[in-house]
Amino acid sequence: ALPVFIRLRANIYGNENLGKSLSNTIRLPQVLPYAPQVTATLPEKMYITGSFPAADNWSKWVMLNPAYGKAGYFYGVVYFSANAEFKVNPDNAWAGRDKGFGQLTIDDQTGSNLVSADAANEGANIKVSNAGWYTVVVETAVNGNKVDYTLHFLPAEVYLFGATNGGTWEWNNNFRFTVPATENGDFVSPALSAAGEV
């Protein structure tokens, strides 16, 4: 708290020329400073950029898909070369909101050994030790006046749903695509059992 000195000014009908008067200086001994609280909002878009699959891709922004019915969740299936590095960013430009290894919670469910590219730097790039296709999920949550980020690093799994698999809408390994081992390989669909929508 700090002291604040004020004076009151009065006039007639708001006219500065009619009966203008000023009070003595008044000392308010303890005034608490106030700053309006800013509430953060969930990002509407999410991108990743980095040295995947080529080292010169830091100026290219890969947009993650918003998850249907899950505000603040974004995902994509991405190929990373060995020791590729990347960052997460709600902007498709370097605007100061990018997140590095120490600025988000890491949930690596792949054994790919995600590490910091520079342990001494909180905002360092996220490094993927093992090459392969991965499902990248970025979860965001409002925490007061900031947004918390969680990076879920999952195996790349793609499934066939709809009429073409007989109308089954359950997760079933019989309807899982074969994931390629290389960047340019094909995701191979299981055999379709019927005609119709996918």
Task: Enumerate the language-model features and the residues they cover.
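Insoluble glucan recognition modules
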Residues: 1-198
